[in-house]
Curated annotation (Swiss-Prot):
Coiled coil spans: 619-653
Short motif (YXXL motif): ranges: 698-701
Keywords from the named record: AIDS, Apoptosis, Clathrin-mediated endocytosis of virus by host, Cleavage on pair of basic residues, Coiled coil, Disulfide bond, Fusion of virus membrane with host endosomal membrane, Fusion of virus membrane with host membrane, Glycoprotein, Host cell membrane, Host endosome, Host membrane, Host-virus interaction, Lipoprotein, Membrane, Palmitate, Signal, Transmembrane, Transmembrane helix, Viral attachment to host cell, Viral envelope protein, Viral immunoevasion, Viral penetration into host cytoplasm, Virion, Virus endocytosis by host, Virus entry into host cell
Name recorded for this polypeptide: Envelope glycoprotein gp160
Sequence segments annotated as region (Fusion peptide): 498-518
Example GO biological process: positive regulation of plasma membrane raft polarization
Di-leucine internalization motif, short sequence motif: residues: 841-842
Gene name linked to the record: env
Lipid attachment residues per UniProt (S-palmitoyl cysteine): C750
């Protein structure tokens, strides 16, 4: 009895141990996290891809910007999209923006294309005999705009004709800025001059001029990349921006090349903005963006004529022939009242940065290149150099401010050092009107902290482009995201490889500010936008390339457009390759068998999915991405190996496959072969037996020979006639004929097979019956065990509740009793006082 009791106790303890072990396993796996791959998450990083340009250029226009943009840019998108990114803060830095460098390179290409040299002017590097030119048909009216006679020189020189050993004398008009005296720069009485750049650089003449008016150019990011735009109205170009959107292309930017003043740019939306890389460093330029335009109207009133001088076969030098009428100076007019108001507002903004000093403006310091000392810009093909002293000397003039301008034809190219170009003159008078939208300033150095002096500057055209690109940055979309979830990849069957959904486009970034849990819900919509974006953009690029293939023959722009197209395809293939290696092709959410390591991030599941954005999460685990990628790849490799092993055992995956109807014919064929083999063996052995007996001298009379057989012991012997007793043995007849013999063998084989199969079925039935009976008994035992423990738990709970109720009731009674005693004591206080007083009186 004691042994049985111990056995029962051990069984009970064993059951309890199994139960607790199961609960422990469940609890241990409840919070276990696994790596999950997400495709289409709103994550990006800064990048420097090759941008392409878009413009509304007109192929029939001869204006050089139109000609350049026609074969350099694709058509603009008629329906540009801009997606707001809520709850997103992004850092911008206009001073370290690769878009500026790309635009700088592009505008250099534009100018090289526009001012393409046709003729080298090296033969003009000869002695020029020059005199002051007074013009023809001059009225000699002395006005403020009449040019000094020394401003334009009439020079004669010897030049080679079409026949190289022959020379002829020609004359041409040159501006004073384009020639230098041979006897020294300060010698104004000299009559011998040379071209200004003959000793420093090669001079080439541009092709005959056409109109020169910049058109807006949009810069666009290739598929797989996006352009982020800062929409803060007071953004100073550096630091965080809280109002961010994403666009495919920038706004139209006019590539105006100018110094000191910024022309035809964009305006600040609210107040004037001051931008500088380090405003306390006087070596850094200050870019001022105005909030209102100031119109500037420029003109060259002279009625010039143009003539050509032949310098040899196929070479012509274009120069000014005559100036009809008074030789009047080129000039620009600005409203003094509006300019002074603008300058005072700029002062107020500068005082916010230099609170202790007095802000003053002064003209540039003398000395240096004319491009820096004056406001240089291109007006209808002529290069104007205007003196801005009247703008920055703070005279307070409210009338029209007239800026005197000089024109140069030999230009130092701003895009290349040591290169000059001769710009042929434009016939007739020239007029152009522009809007001043900003200015470039420099601050004087020194220790004077009470007076801050600012002067106009410029020269580095990158600052011109920065004034327009300050609010943009290019980012590379990272569509693959990794995050921990409670889901684990369970299946081992091979997944069907679906077609991928394409590379990420800018459209889905609208969910960038959402939490990871909210953003993951829209993955399908995002991925579809990505695919449509890349397909549409690639189609536009290809259509533009096909339309312009005669202009894109191995040019830098054809290569750039093709590079942008190939870059998008490369991004797509790279992402799809990773998804394929991880076994996630065609999936937006893909679970893995890689457990999440808390060393990567120890945040809980709720903290990650309910409080963090994908960008914040990417920064959290960015250093471990390569490690996680490697683990996912190793896990997928192991899974594929397991799949291969499983496929090798696939024939034994299910016993029901043995009874498949498609295999019955194969079973029948095997059965017929076995029966035929048995019959053949029987015939062969019968023939061999007969042959053997014949060789021994025995010849059977018939196949019906009787074979004696013994009679059973319980059967009486038969009595023949005459009462003679027969032998105890009897004979049975053999079957007659070959077919009968075969049939008898087949019948015996079938009977044998039937008996064996019946015995096998009986054995299997008994085994199954015993197994089912045992299983049923086990289930009944488990059910009784569950009922027993349920009843025990119920009784324990009831007992616990009863005990708790009794304890609570006892405690309540005690509390009530204590309260009653305290109440009675309070009620008896007056009586006790009275009794005490009575005793004291007695």
């Amino acid at each position: 009895m004691r042994v049985r009791g111990m056995q029962r106790n051990w069984q009970t303890l064993g059951n309890w141990g199994i139960l607790f072990l199961g609960i422990l396993i469940i609890c241990s796996n409840a919070d276990k996290l696994w790596v999950t791959v997400y495709y289409g998450v709103p994550v990006w990083k800064e990048a420097t891809p090759t941008l392409f340009c878009a413009s509304d250029a007109k192929a029939y226009e001869k204006e050089v910007h139109n000609v350049w943009a026609t074969h350099a840019c694709v058509p603009t998108d008629p329906n540009p999209q801009e997606v707001e990114m809520e709850n997103v803060t992004e850092n911008f830095n206009m001073w370290k923006n690769n878009m500026v460098e790309q635009m700088h390179t592009d505008i250099i290409s534009l100018w090289d294309e526009s001012l393409k040299p046709c003729v080298e002017l090296t033969p003009l590097c000869v002695t020029l005999n020059c005199t002051d030119y007074k013009g023809t048909n001059s009225t000699n009216n002395a006005t403020s705009t009449v040019v000094s006679p020394a401003e334009i020189k009439n020079c004669s020189f010897n030049i080679t004709t079409e026949i190289k050993d022959k020379k002829k004398k020609e004359s041409a008009l040159f501006y004073r800025l384009d020639v230098l005296p041979l006897n020294g720069e300060g010698n104004n009485s000299s009559t011998e001059y040379r071209l200004i750049n003959c000793n420093t650089s090669t001079i080439t003449q541009t092709c005959p001029k056409v109109t020169f008016e910049p058109i807006p150019i949009h810069y666009c990011a290739p598929a797989g990349f996006a352009i982020l735009k800062c929409k803060d109205k007071r953004f100073n170009g550096t630091g965080p921006c809280k109002n961010v959107s994403t666009v495919q292309c920038t706004h139209g930017i006019k590539p105006v090349v100018s110094t000191q003043l910024l022309l035809n740019g964009s305006l600040a939306e609210e107040e004037i903005i001051i931008r500088s890389e380090n405003i306390t460093d006087n070596t850094k330029n200050i870019i001022v963006q105005l909030n209102e335009t100031v119109q500037i109207n420029c003109t060259r009133p002279n009625n010039n004529t143009r003539k050509s001088i032949h310098m040899g076969p196929g070479k012509a030098f274009y120069t000014t022939g005559d100036i009809i009428g008074d030789i009047r100076q080129a000039h620009c007019n600005i409203s003094g009242e509006k300019w002074n108001m603008t300058l005072s507002r700029v002062k107020e903004k500068l005082k916010e940065h230099f609170k202790n000093g007095t802000i003053t403006f002064k003209p540039p310091n003398p000395g240096g290149d004319p491009e820096i000392l004056t406001h240089m810009f291109n007006c209808a093909g002529e290069f104007f150099y205007c003196n801005t002293t009247k703008l920055f000397n703070e005279t307070g003039e409210n009338g029209t401010i007239t800026l005197p301008c000089r024109i140069k034809q030999i230009i130092n190219m701003w895009q290349k050092v040591g290169k000059a170009i001769y710009a042929p003159p434009i016939a007739g008078s020239i007029n152009c009107s522009s809007n001043i939208t900003g200015m470039i300033l420099t601050r004087d150095g020194g220790n004077n902290t009470h007076n801050e002096t600012f002067r106009p500057g410029g020269g580095d055209m990158r600052d011109n482009w920065r004034s327009e690109l300050y609010k943009y940055k290019v980012v590379q979309i990272e569509p693959l995201g990794i995050a921990p979830t409670r889901a684990r990849r369970r299946v081992v069957q091979r997944e069907k490889r679906a077609v991928g959904l394409g590379a990420v486009f800018f459209g889905f970034l609208g969910a960038a500010g959402s939490t990871m849990g909210a953003a993951s819900i829209t993955l399908t919509v995002q991925a579809r936008q990505l695919l449509s974006g890349i397909v549409q953009q690639q189609s536009n690029l290809l259509r533009a390339i096909e339309a312009q293939q005669h202009l894109l023959q191995l040019t830098v722009w054809g290569i750039k457009q093709l590079r942008a197209r190939i870059l998008a395809v490369e991004r797509y293939l790279k992402d799809q390759q990773l998804l394929g290696i991880w076994g996630c092709s065609g999936k937006l959410i893909c679970t893995t068998n890689v457990p999440w390591n808390s060393s990567w991030s120890n945040k809980s599941w709720e903290e990650i999915w309910n409080n963090m954005t994908w960008m914040e999460w990417e920064k959290e685990i960015g250093n471990y991405s390569d490690t996680i990628y490697k683990l996912i790849e190793e896990s997928q490799t192991q899974q594929e190996k397991n799949e291969q092993d499983l496929l090798a055992l696939d024939k034994w995956a299910s016993l029901w496959n043995w009874f498949d109807i498609t295999k019955w014919l194969w079973y029948i064929k095997i059965f017929i072969m076995i029966i035929g083999g048995l019959i053949g063996l029987r015939i062969a052995f019968a023939v061999l037996s007969v042959v053997n007996r014949v060789r021994q001298g025995y010849s059977p009379l018939s196949f019906q020979t009787l074979i004696p057989t013994s009679r059973g012991a319980d059967r009486p012997e038969g009595i023949e006639e005459e009462g003679g007793e027969q032998d105890k043995n009897r004979s049975v007849r053999l079957v007659s004929g070959f077919l009968a013999l075969a049939w008898d063998d087949l019948r015996n084989l079938c009977l044998f097979s039937y008996r064996q199969l019946r015995n096998l079925i009986l054995i299997v039935t008994r085994i199954l019956e015993r197994g089912l009976r045992g299983g049923w008994e086990a289930l009944k035992y488990l059910w009784n065990l569950v009922q027993y423990w349920s009843q025990e738990l119920k009784n324990s709970a009831i007992s616990l509740l009863n005990t708790t109720a009794i304890a609570v009731a006892g405690g309540t009674d005690r509390i009530i009793e204590i309260g009653q005693r305290a109440f009675r004591a309070l009620l008896h206080i007056p009586r006790r006082i009275r009794q005490g007083l009575e005793r004291a009186l007695l």
